[in-house]
Amino acid sequence: MIKMNIVFAYPTGLNPQKGGVERITDIIAKILLKRGYTIFYLNWKREQDNYEYPVPVIDLPSSNLEDPNNLEVYNRFLKENRIDVIINQHGLYEGTYFLSQVKVQNVKIISVLHSDPFGYYNHLFADLMTLRDSSIKEKVKRVARFFLYRKVKKIIHRSLVNHYTFI
């Protein structure tokens, strides 16, 4: 069996003490390491911590994914490390388009969705109508949100369609 080179991409550090995605990624990475795969983590908003990561961690130079230097560093990393698979652990969000800009041939991208992409959209009205506090100002804002609901829902729908058509 051919052992692949795999990178897990996530905006922040994949410290298993921080949350569920981080914990699961850490477990999977350790299992794959034991089976002989080469694993890396790629981040663009990682804060320094004291966790001893089991794999090399690559930080993009800027947290702004539109920075051209990030794309150059990203593609050089993929080529130099002969990456076969990119596992995008942030599939619902901003990194998806950036990670797809692979200039190296035969690299597979797997985007993982860790929650329901339409969850917020399906419950938007209830969220918009919830009073944040009992002030007059909040009640006026609630009325404004009521009248803006259709427009906001349309904008969110368009954004979801564009994002998931892309994926």
Predicted regions and their residues:
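Membrane-proximal helix-turn-helix segments that form the acceptor-binding/catalytic region
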Residues: D133-I167
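Extreme N-terminal starter segment of soluble prokaryotic enzymes
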Residues: I2-V7
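A short, glycine/small-residue-rich beta-strand->loop->alpha-helix junction that serves as a flexible
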Residues: Y10-D26, N88
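Short His-centered aromatic/hydrophobic patch
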Residues: N88-E94, L113
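N-terminal strand-loop element at the rim of the active site
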Residues: P11-Q17, K30-E66
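Glycine-rich phosphate-binding loop signature in dinucleotide/nucleotide-binding domains
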Residues: L78-D84
